[in-house]
C-alpha cells in the first residue's frame, strides 16, 4: 500500500513536517502568511502535485530571520511530495506542448549565446520532454529525469525521446563533470531540498558549465503588488526565492551568477484564462465566452507574472 493510501484518512495537518531554512540552516523565522488548512485537498496528493497543479497556497509561508529566504513551514512530508509527483496523469499539462516548444526555442537562443558548442545538456524535472525535444532538434546531446512515469511515457510516445524516471538523485548517468549545461525549468522551487539539488548539479557539470534556472520571483514588483493573490503562491511551491536569495544559494553551491532577467513563457490564451479563474471568478465566464467567440482559445500568448531566469556558471 502506498503512503498516499495509508495516510488518506489522516487530517492534512497530520501529513506535515517542520523544516529549517534550506539556505542558512537556521530555524528562526517570521510567519508571512498564516495557514488555510480548511481549503486543503486533504486526500489527493496526486492531484495536488501534478505538473499543472494550481491549488492556491494553504500552507504557512515563513521568512528566515537570518538570511531572508521565504519557504513553506510546516509543509507536506517529503515522501508524500515525491509520491504525489510520481503518480497520476496530466492531459491538461501536455495539451500545451506546442506552446512550451515555442518558449523553449527562445530559451535555447539564450543558452547558445553562452554555450554555442551545443554539447551535452541535462534537463531536471523534464516533465513531458518539450525542452529536450527542441534541444535535440538543434543538435544537443540530451538527457533528462522526471519523477512522473506517465510524463516519461508521453515523451517517449510523442517525441521519441527517453527520459529517466525519478529524481536527479536516481540518474543512471552519474559521472562527475558529465554535462555542459543543466536546466531547471520551473523546478527548483518544487524540490524538497533545493540546496542538495544544486550541489548535485555542480557535481555533474563540467568546470565552467552552465546552469539555467527559472523560478517565480517573490521579490518581483508584481508579486509585491498582488500579495497573497499572486498567482504563483501555490501549495506546490516549497521555496520562494528573490534575486538576493537565489544568488546566495547559487554562490553557496559552487556557482557564479552571470545574468538575472525577466522570463517570459508562452501558453494558449484559453489555458491562461482558466488558470486565472480562482483569481478573477467574476470575469472568467465573460473572458471564456469571448475567447471562444473570437477564436482566441488556441492563440499562443507570451506572459510574465514575476518569473525570473538565472544564468550561472560552475566555478573552477
Go through the PLM ranges and name each one.
Residues 22-26, 66:
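Short, cysteine/histidine-rich loop/knuckle motifs that typically chelate Zn2+
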Residues 2-18, 37-57, 258-316:
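A C-terminal cap/extension of S-adenosyl-L-methionine-dependent methyltransferases
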Residues 35-45, 213-239, 244-251, 271-275:
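Short, glycine-/aromatic-enriched active-site segment of Class I SAM-dependent methyltransferases
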